[in-house]
Amino acid sequence: MPNEYEAMIRTDIPSSARIWNFWMGGNDFYEVDRVVGEASLKIDPDIATVAVQSRQFLARVVRYLAGEARIRQFLDIGTGLPTMQNTHEVAQAVARESKVVYIDNDPKALTHARALLNSTTDEGVTAYLDCDFHAPDQIVAEARNILNFTEPIGVMFMGVLGHARTYEDMVHIVRTVMDATPSGSYLALWDGTTDSQAYVTLCDEYTKSGGVPYVPRTQDAIRAVFDGFEFVESGFGPITAWRNDATQDGAWQSISSYGGVARKP
């Protein structure tokens, strides 16, 4: 494990990546994350369901992009800690030659990802870059060293847009990355919304605990990020309903998390 990242890990303040891992039943968290994670569950018991369902949504999205849409390059921004059904595993199971670039700057996520996130095929490429979500120009510049930006790319913002300080920042981050991609690329994202007052309260309390602020937004604000893009079938809606089938646990359960997938014309 890279010592430079181990030394940067803060165990005195909570991390959204580690709390998310706690909610998903993982082991990569510290006591401060467990305390905040358990307190969050008391405020919004649905958050554990959101954690599981968001991962299932990601898997369905990647299978669609690698399969029907024939995308062979993926840029997963704000990926967090490795867990089940990681993007490269799903993509390379469909298309062995898939290239996947993960973006995050959480030290523990970087430490674990570089140790665990390896291509599952000889033909595929899997890389993990240390970039700040708030620096889209840097993300594009570093991703260009691995991905071919003259060919379509599947760009993913899975449950991270709330880290944007303002609505304008959120749109700027997404648009800067998407503007660098060619026609035929896809934007895939989801986020929690203000439909649930419990979720809004959870985000407020998380910020008070010392974590990096997370700002829930309305459905309309999240949907507006897709303006100018063409939604694929299923459109924009609850992540539990997006191209879902009855075989998944908790299928069609209503939660206040919305997203979709859209093609860049």
Name each model feature, range by range.
Residues M1-C131, P136-F149, S256-S257:
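Rossmann-like AdoMet
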Residues W20, E230-R243:
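Conserved S-adenosyl-L-methionine
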Residues F133-H134, A143-V171:
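A short SAM/SAH-binding and catalytic strip from SAM-dependent methyltransferases
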Residues G154-F157, A180-G192:
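Conserved beta-strand signature within the Rossmann-like core of class I S-adenosyl-L-methionine
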Residues V171-S183:
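A short glycine-rich, Lys/Arg-flanked "PGG" loop and its adjoining helix->strand segment in the class I
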Residues Q197-G211:
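Short, glycine-/aromatic-enriched active-site segment of Class I SAM-dependent methyltransferases
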Residues P213-F236:
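Short alpha-helix
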Residues A241-P265:
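Core SAM-dependent methyltransferase catalytic element
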